[in-house]
A protein has these predicted regions:
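Residue-level recognition of single "structural anchor" positions
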Residues: 1-219
């Protein structure tokens, strides 16, 4: 099959798959959700881009943001883009749109974008009172709702190898985390194992996502 033919049909197939996903992935009941991102590149790596190619924001480093449900082995939301807060926010917003409104127990790595995105999408706005009767009201801010529970897995690396793994609670209470883990049929501790295993499956089955191989697909 000619490469131009493949390039013609792939966008059409992708749009159709997205429509099918949007149709079926509604009102999903998610008890637990793991967030992560996969690195790859388009055409060439970021450090090899020219100034003009960087302005286009099409080539170079690309990240596949994934929200993964370890209970039902489902990816209810994903985003392709740069490693920015706006793309993290888009991922969480798509996840919320696909769910039934219940906030799942979130876990991820220590990337700070997730905490900010969760607060922006699920947070409740608070309007502070002003002092006195004159002047503008203070700028409103967002606070995490009582049922938002989010913990991160922190990996310490030395010379590229993981030497220590710890966890940290960002939103919620220790009691909420313990209750979520007791209710989970798959997780017995704060982890991102499910989404990391899913990432490995993606890399093994797609040459576009393969790393450190002599058959990387970039054309």
């Amino acid at each position: 099959v000619d490469k131009d033919t493949v390039n013609h049909w792939l966008p059409l197939l992708g749009c159709h798959c997205q429509e099918v996903m949007n149709y079926f992935f509604r009102n999903l009941h998610l008890e637990e959700c793991q967030l992560d991102e996969l690195w790859t590149f388009i055409y060439k790596k970021e450090k090899q881009l020219t100034a003009l190619e960087k302005l286009a924001e099409v080539y170079g480093d690309a990240w596949v943001w994934i929200a993964f449900s370890p209970v039902c082995k489902l990816v209810p939301a994903w985003v392709v883009g740069k490693r920015t807060l706006s793309h993290a926010r888009r991922l969480v917003f798509r996840l919320k749109s696909a769910s039934d409104g219940q906030i799942p127990f979130f876990t991820s790595d220590e990337l700070p974008h997730y905490a900010d995105a969760l607060l922006e999408v699920y947070g409740e706005q608070v309007q502070p009172l002003r002092n006195g009767t004159r002047g503008r009201f203070p700028k409103p801010y967002r606070v995490p709702p009582p049922d938002l529970c989010y913990a991160v897995v922190v990996k310490k690396r030395e010379q590229g190898r993981v030497v220590e793994v710890s966890t940290r609670l960002v939103y919620g209470t220790t009691q909420q985390v313990e209750a979520a883990l007791q209710a989970s049929p798959v997780s017995h501790a704060i982890n991102t194992y499910g989404v990391e295993r899913n990432n490995l499956t993606i890399r093994q089955h797609s040459r576009r996502m393969s790393r450190k191989v002599n058959a990387f697909s970039k054309d």
